[in-house]
């Protein structure tokens, strides 16, 4: 499992705007639907920027103090090769370790877009079909 606490990674890398633009999107207006789209685009942009390949589809939900993002596809060719050889655990371990390393970027993008502090962040991946799940816990309002 990959979990990142806000206190563990206070520094930020790419801004939400940079991540969204790298996914081909634009910054949102102040509607809930556009914020969900912006969060999804920021996660796509982060994966694209850091893995060299992005998901094929993404959707985000914002519910009270929680943000859930589901990303479809986006495995790299070397990850697909390892999966074909039965090494799903190795791919999962690498992905989750990498997400811990770049968690501050994901958290920073969500904080910037929603204007709320992220208390903790968790990432998980499954392979059949390939899906990545990004979960953020927001500070209560």
Residues of each region from the PLM?
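Intrinsic-disorder-associated, low-complexity terminal segments enriched in Asp/Asn/His/Tyr and depleted
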Residues: 5-9
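Intrinsically disordered or compositionally simple regulatory linkers and C-terminal tails
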Residues: 11, 15-16
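Interaction-mediating elements
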Residues: 19-141
């Amino acid at each position: 499992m990959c979990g990142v606490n806000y206190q563990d990674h206070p520094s930020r890398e790419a801004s939400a705007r940079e991540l969204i633009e790298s996914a081909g999107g634009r910054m949102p207006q102040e509607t809930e639907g556009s914020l969900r789209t912006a969060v999804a685009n920021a996660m796509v942009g982060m994966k694209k920027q850091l893995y060299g390949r992005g998901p094929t589809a993404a959707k985000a939900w914002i519910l009270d103090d929680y943000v859930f993002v589901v990303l479809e596809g986006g495995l790299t060719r070397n990850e697909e090769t390892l999966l074909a050889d039965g090494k799903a655990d190795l791919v999962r371990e690498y992905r989750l370790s990498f997400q811990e390393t770049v968690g501050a970027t994901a958290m920073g993008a969500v904080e910037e877009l929603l204007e709320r502090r992220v208390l903790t962040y968790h990432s998980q991946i499954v392979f059949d079909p390939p899906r990545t799940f990004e979960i953020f816990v927001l500070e209560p309002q």
